[in-house]
C-alpha cells in the first residue's frame, strides 16, 4: 500500500435545487444547512480518504444547476475523473433531465471514451415522503444509459453520502486499472515488429 495520495476530481451535476451542495457539505464537513442558497458558478471542497487500501484526495466540484450559469460551470468539467449525475427523487423533471446533463458533461469535458467514463447516479432527498421517481425507474435509466451504479442518498439524514463518494472513487480506480491492463496487453514484439495479441479494449 502506497502512502502517496492520488488526487481525483469529481463533478456533481444536476438541476438546481436537487441538493448537490448539501451532499458535498455533508460529506466534507458533516453539516447540513436547510437554508442553503443555490450555488452561483462553481465551488469545490477537498477530502482525504482511503478506499480499498488506496489513499485519495477527493476534489469535489459543485456546479450551479441553472441554465443561466452554464457558461460559468462548463469550463470546470475538463480534467474530471468522475461525474456524479444527481437528481431529487421528489422532482421528476430533475430525473428526466439526467440525459441532458450527461450529454453536456461529455461534450464540455471532451470525454474521449464516453462508454467507459465513470458516471455514478444519485437519487437524492430520499428522506422526502412525496417521491415522484421510483428506485426501479432510476435503476432502469442507469442500465439503459451506461450501466451506471445507482445510489439513493439524503444529505439531510446522511443516508449513503459517504458510500456515494467512495463508490465514485472505486469507479475511477476500476477504470484506471482497466487502462493499465490494456496498456500492458498492447506490447510490441521487437523481433517481429508486430503487436502482441491482446484481449483488451
From Swiss-Prot:
Where Mg(2+) binds, per the record, is at 21, 39, 62
User: Do you know which SMART domains this protein is assigned to?
Assistant: RAB, RAN, RAS, RHO
Residue numbers carrying Phosphoserine:
34
Protein localization: Cell membrane; Cytoplasmic vesicle, Phagosome membrane
* Catalytic reaction(s) noted: GTP + H2O = GDP + phosphate + H(+)
Q: InterPro entries per the record?
A: P-loop_NTPase, Rab9, Small_GTP-bd, Small_GTPase
Residues with covalent lipid (S-geranylgeranyl cysteine) sit at 200-201
Q: How is its activity regulated?
A: Regulated by guanine nucleotide exchange factors (GEFs) which promote the exchange of bound GDP for free GTP. Regulated by GTPase activating proteins (GAPs) which increase the GTP hydrolysis activity. Inhibited by GDP dissociation inhibitors (GDIs).
What cofactor(s) does the depicted protein rely on?
Mg(2+)
GO cellular component, alphabetical, reads:
phagocytic vesicle; phagocytic vesicle membrane; plasma membrane
Which sites bind GTP? 18-22, 33-34, 36, 38-39, 65, 124-125, 155-156
Q: Name one GO biological process term.
A: protein transport
Q: Motif (Switch 1) spans which residues? A: 31-42
Instruction: Quote the function comment for this protein.
Output: The small GTPases Rab are key regulators of intracellular membrane trafficking, from the formation of transport vesicles to their fusion with membranes. Rabs cycle between an inactive GDP-bound form and an active GTP-bound form that is able to recruit to membranes different sets of downstream effectors directly responsible for vesicle formation, movement, tethering and fusion. RAB9B is involved in the transport of proteins between the endosomes and the trans Golgi network.
What UniProt notes about the protein's domains is: Switch 1, switch 2 and the interswitch regions are characteristic of Rab GTPases and mediate the interactions with Rab downstream effectors. The switch regions undergo conformational changes upon nucleotide binding which drives interaction with specific sets of effector proteins, with most effectors only binding to GTP-bound Rab.
The family assignment reads: Belongs to the small GTPase superfamily. Rab family.
Q: How does it assemble?
A: Interacts (GTP-bound form) with SGSM1; the GDP-bound form has much lower affinity for SGSM1. The GTP-bound form but not the GDP-bound form interacts with HPS4 and the BLOC-3 complex (heterodimer of HPS1 and HPS4) but does not interact with HPS1 alone. Interacts (GTP-bound form) with NDE1.
What is the protein name stated in its UniProt record? Ras-related protein Rab-9B
User: What gene, per UniProt, encodes this protein?
Assistant: Rab9b
